Structure formats: C-alpha cells, structure tokens
A protein has these predicted regions:
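Active-site phosphate-binding/coordination module
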Residues: 21-124
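Conserved acidic, metal-coordinating active-site core of Asp-based
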Residues: 98, 102-223, 232
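Asp-based, Mg2+/Mn2+-dependent phosphohydrolase catalytic module
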Residues: 223, 228-261
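Asp-based phosphoryl-transfer active-site loop
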Residues: 5-21, 221
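Residue-level signal for inorganic ion chemistry
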Residues: 15, 35, 46, 69, ...
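Alpha-helical segments flanking ligand/cofactor-binding loops in enzyme cores
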Residues: 29, 33, 218-219, 235-238
Length: 261
C-alpha cells in the first residue's frame, strides 16, 4: 500500500531546497505549489534571518517560515512576525564568559529583534560592516540568536563546552558555516517550534515529512514521522533520516514530493 500524502511539509533552505546557485529551482517550487493546492501545509524551516528570505521569497509561496532555527515564526502571506522566542542577552553573555574562563578562543556576534542585523565583537567576520562593541554592549537586551565563531582549529572543544555545559539552559546547534555555533533560547529548535504549531493545526507528527541536510535539522527529523536527508547531508543527518534522497542540486525535494503531488 502506498504511503499517504503528507499533510505537513517541513523544508530547510540552504543545502536542501536552495541549490548551489542560491536559487530555488522551478521544479522544487512547482512541487511545493502543487502540495499547497492539494491542501498540505508547507513550512520553511531555516537558520536564516527573515531579511535573507528575500532572494528566494518569490519561490516560497505563502508559507510559514521558521527563521533563526525557530526563534522567529514569520508569515510570508501577511509579512509579519507571528511569534518571537528571545534569548536573554545576559544569559548568553554569562555562558560566553564562563567558557572563555577555560581559555578557549572565539569571537561572538548576536542577531537582534526583530531582524535588525548582526552586531558583533571586533574580529567577527572582519570586513563585514556591522555595529561593533564589547560583549557587554552587544548582549544588551533580548536577542534572537547568538553566534560563536571559533578561531583557528578550535571548533570541537568550543562545541563541546557549549553543547554539554549549558544543556537545559541554551539550545546549541550548527548549520552550514564551518566553525560557527548558533545559540538560541532553551527549547527553541525547528522541531520544538513546529510541534507547537502542528498541535494548533491538528496535525500529527506521523502526517509530516521533513527535508534537511545539517545538524540544525535533527530535532525536526526526530519530530516528523518521515524525514529525508539530502544526498549532500552530513553523515549524522543521514543516519537520523528515514530516507536518504538525491543531492540538493538535483531537485531532491521535488523528487520525493512528486510521489503524491
């Protein structure tokens, strides 16, 4: 018996729906449009800020977007923020200071609310224009996401320090940029936020399918009844998926959705 069509489609952007040319292919876009027309809900789940949806927005239809890994729930149809899950800047600051006491070397930036862009310490993305300040200055107020960039080859111990040292206090993950940690409020992940939304829509995890390629998609994979890792996904993501699909540059999302739509 063929699998029933999903009622909820969760799609990561970079390395999944978006190709290496930084665009959504016509085939992928058309598959999402057919799914929406057939009554399925489409949710874009990305680490991107809202402002960086703009280059691909025309291909996303009237979806809901989980930006900053779920910290911001954004309605593309009405162009407004539906939910904001902020991290207390001082909580983030104390975590950074504690890890730095161990001698680990890294630089920090934060994303403000809502979508006002990066502000960072000196040395974070040198050559990139952004407001600069001390750790105390950039952590003033609520933040959407904290960013930790390792210096040199020190990523692994920094990942270990934040991911294990603050379990239950911070949500720590990484996506496509080498040597970059993304930190949100505890409990805020693609999977955690979609669980709340799906309950409101009356959709069970068994009726959902998720597409992704990086560790920040793992919570979404654990939540959804079906999950598809891209052929280009990291090994741990492939292991967590119920299926491994094609490379993202080969319309991998459409290849799966065309079974039903």
């Amino acid at each position: 018996m063929p699998e029933p069509a999903p009622r909820l489609i969760l799609v990561d952007l970079d390395g999944t729906l978006v190709g290496a040319n930084h665009e959504v292919s016509q085939r992928n876009s058309a598959a999402l449009e057919r799914a929406t027309t057939a009554g399925a809900r489409v949710v874009i789940a990305t680490g991107r800020p809202v402002r960086l949806l703009e280059p691909v927005r025309a291909s996303l239809g009237h979806s809901i977007a989980l930006c900053y890994n779920g910290a911001i729930v954004f309605d593309l149809a009405s162009d407004r923020v539906l939910e904001a899950h902020l991290l207390d800047g001082r909580v983030f600051q104390r975590a950074v200071e504690k890890v730095r006491e161990s001698g680990l070397d890294f630089v920090v930036a934060v994303e403000g609310m809502p979508d006002v862009g990066l502000r960072g310490e000196e040395g974070f993305r040198e050559g990139f224009e952004m407001p600069r300040g001390t750790l105390d200055e950039i952590c003033d107020g609520g933040i959407v996401k904290g960013l930790i960039r390792a210096k040199g080859d020190g990523f692994a111990p920094i990942w270990e320090a934040f991911s294990t040292g603050f379990r239950g206090e911070l949500e720590v993950t990484r996506s496509g940029i080498e040597g970059l940690l993304e930190i949100s409020r505890a409990g805020i992940s693609k999977g955690g936020v979609i669980d709340e939304l799906a309950r409101g829509w009356g959709i069970d995890p068994a009726d959902a399918i998720a597409f992704g390629d990086m560790p920040n998609d793992l919570e979404m994979f654990r939540w959804a009844g079906r999950s598809v890792a891209m052929g280009n996904a990291e090994p741990e993501v492939k292991l967590a998926a119920t299926e491994v699909g094609a490379h993202h540059d080969d319309d991998a999302v459409a290849q799966v959705l065309e079974r039903w739509f």
